[in-house]
UniProtKB/Swiss-Prot annotation:
Name recorded for this polypeptide: Adenosine deaminase 2
Reactions it catalyzes: adenosine + H2O + H(+) = inosine + NH4(+)
The species this protein was found in: Xenopus laevis (African clawed frog)
GO MF annotation, one: adenosine receptor binding
Binding note for cofactor: Binds 1 zinc ion per subunit.
UniProt: substrate binding residues: 107, 198-205, 287, 320, 436
Cross-referenced CDD domains: ADGF (cd01321)
Amino acid sequence: MACVSHWLLLLSLASATLSRPLWSERNGLIEMENSIRLGGNIILTPSEATANQKLMTVKGAEFKEAESTGLFPPSMHFFKARPLIQQSHVFSILHQMPKGGALHLHDFAILSVDWLVKNASYMADCYMCLTRDGGVRFLFAKPAPVGMLPPGCSEWILLETYRKKLGDVTEFDKGLIRNLTLLTDSPEPHIPSQDEIWRRFEGAFITASGLICYAPVFKEYFYESLRELYEDNIQYLEMRAMLPPVYELDGTVHDQFWSMAIYRDMANKFVGAHPDFLGAKIIYTVHRHEDLAQVTEAVHLAMKLMEAFPEIMAGFDLVGQEDAGHSLYQLSDALNIPSKLGVKLPYFFHAGETNWQGKDVDENVLDALLLNTTRIGHGYALLKHPVARNLSLELNVPLEICPISNQVLLLVSDLRNHPAAVLMAEGHPLVVSSDDPSIFGAQGISYDFYEMFMGIGGAKADLRTLKKLAENSIKYSALSKEGKEKLTEIWQKKWDKFIKDLAMNWKKEL
């Protein structure tokens, strides 16, 4: 950055003394701008250079087609763009690319909802009730539940019996799937405001929780989530988890320590079967609607979980709609407790997930940094706070960019206009993730990589950009030095194979 400032100073001095445009400096300035872009300073190997040439040929062809048809997926709502992305050769390449770690995903919105409906809801003793607004709630019980109805719900219906009476079970299951996602063919008129989309968004979590919080489903859901991420060529997961009570048919209710032990054991089981996957860590979260006393209690619990599960517990965060919840400053007395006690509790705060400016909610980006956050979730408002932006750079605190989430939750419509476009151009530390892919109708993080590469990064984003994003996911993870080295080793082997396949085999006619 000092080099850039030096060049700009010389240019301004020259412009002050000369009346003619300094066209002789144009190429140098463009080259300088390209060099400071995210990944711009990476020197590609010969094989990577060949692979990059093929990648950019494919990307250029898709840009040209978009200009001809007027259909450019990053400029469209994801629900409409999704089938176009699935047909994209660029997307196919990104799916095959080893992406390192997925660092921003939420516990009950990782695995495709098809699995929940086609597997969990077909398990014995699964009951359903219908809400007044057309939604559903689930409960496992034996014998049949008496009472225990959520507000505004019908009587409990045993799904096994109900399905036997249906003429079209497939259509019924499609209806259940719709209740677990936000997918719609016409997103614009059906989603009028941020408050409404957040109401539906959190409703999908509530619906899913009735299935996932049943202990047998809880275990398999996490294992299958790891499998789906693995199939998307992800080598490591950091998952935000609220650790709600998990129940058994006999009435036993498990606490947060039980859930953490299950996450640890299932992750170890998956790694045992897939040694080219490093594992998972958990970021314990509570809702930002909770009051100071409740957050204080949660912080104390987080410290206990850190002590009990040092190998899998990564830290603490607050979740939920920022505009409607408490700000970090309002909860600072609770969040300052670990530092006052001399206890290490890393923070991974959601901050600045808002369109507002000059309110408590967008000042969360500054307060997150003052609270020594390890990463910033979303950070959509960071551009409006130059001091926080510079502090983030100085402290080397990355933003977790989740493009599809930001679009679906109505922060931005055309992803070419996402604030991360500016941050990428400046070389700001960033990682890519997918937040809640199952609710958005996505899987893994390849869809978000596509939006980042094609839309936010613009035409000049290339293999260096992708490599830097993957490397950042390792560099800025919560892993120890040894863990990062091991993950780098796993990723590098896969990266080298990916480059070889792309350079030598993929679309040989290019």
